[in-house]
C-alpha cells in the first residue's frame, strides 16, 4: 500500500472518532488490577494509574483535558525516562497525551492511545520550566522543513537526539513514531550504535513530538501486541520510500466504521456508562 493510501486510512481512523465517545463519561480509573485490554487502536484499561502532575523532572501539558492516565508500566516509564534526562542535565521533559481514565476511543486526534500504553512527548527540552499558561496552551516546535525532506538545522539539537535514543533503549518500549525527516536525521547522527533505531518508526505528522508505545504487560492476557518492527535500523529503502511522490491513481479508501470492542471492554462500558 502506498503512503498516500496509508495517510488517508490514518485520517479516516482518526476522524471516525470525532463524535463524542462513551469513554469520555468515565471520569476515574476503573478499580481492579492493572489490565490493558485489546489493541492499541481498539481497547481499554482496568486499574489505570494517574501520572503525578507535580514532578521536578517533567511537566504535564493540557491537564484540563485529563489525558494523563495509563498502565502503571507507562507511568514508571515516564518517570524513568525523565529522571535519566534530568541526570544528564538535558532539560525538562514535556508530557502530552497518554490516555483517558479507562482508555478507549478518543473523540479526535488519536486512533490509538486506548490501552494505557501510549504517550506523546514533545521534542523540546526547556531549561526553564514552563508556566501554567504555557502548559495549558503549549506551543509545538515544528522541527521539520516545509518540504518535509529534512529537519530544520537551527532547531535540531543534540539533546533531542539523546531524548529519543534514551526512550528507544528502554526495555519496555517497542515503537517510537516520529516524522520521516526526524528518523532520517537520527540515522545520520547515530554513528555505530544503531540497534535502538529499529524501534524508531517513520510516520505521518509527528513533526514536533514523538509517540512512544510500550509492549503489552506480561500479565495483561487480553492485550494484543503488534509484531516487532522489521530487523535492521530502518534507515535504508523503507525510510527513503517516505520521501517519494505518491503514485498516480491513488484512490481514497472507503470510510470504515470502528470495529467492535473487545468483549471485556464492552462489558466495562455496559457497567460504568449509563
Curated annotation (Swiss-Prot):
One of the protein's GO biological processes? peptidoglycan metabolic process
Domain of life (superkingdom): Bacteria
Tell me the cofactor note. Answer: Binds 2 Zn(2+) ions per subunit. Zn(2+) ion 1 is bound in the active site. Zn(2+) ion 2 is bound at the dimer interface by residues from both subunits.
The record's keywords, sorted A to Z, are: Disulfide bond, Hydrolase, Metal-binding, Metalloprotease, Periplasm, Protease, Signal, Zinc
Checking Gene3D superfamilies in the record gives: 3.30.1380.10
- Binding residues annotated for Zn(2+) 1, in chain numbering: 110, 113, 120, 211
Task: Give the InterPro entries listed for this entry.
Answer: Hedgehog_sig/DD-Pept_Zn-bd_sf (IPR009045), Peptidase_M74 (IPR005073)
Question: Would I find Transcription among this entry's keywords?
Answer: no
Which GO CC annotations does the UniProt entry carry? outer membrane-bounded periplasmic space
Signal peptide positions are 1-19
Q: Name one GO molecular function term.
A: metal ion binding
**Location(s) in or outside the cell:** Periplasm
Which coarse location class applies to the principal site listed for this UniProt protein?
Answer: periplasm
**EC number(s) of the enzyme?**
3.4.24.-
The UniProt similarity line reads:
Belongs to the peptidase M74 family.
Q: What is known about what this protein does?
A: Murein endopeptidase that cleaves the D-alanyl-meso-2,6-diamino-pimelyl amide bond that connects peptidoglycan strands. Likely plays a role in the removal of murein from the sacculus.
Q: What is this protein called?
A: Penicillin-insensitive murein endopeptidase
**Species of origin:** Escherichia coli O17:K52:H18 (strain UMN026 / ExPEC)
Chain's gene name: mepA
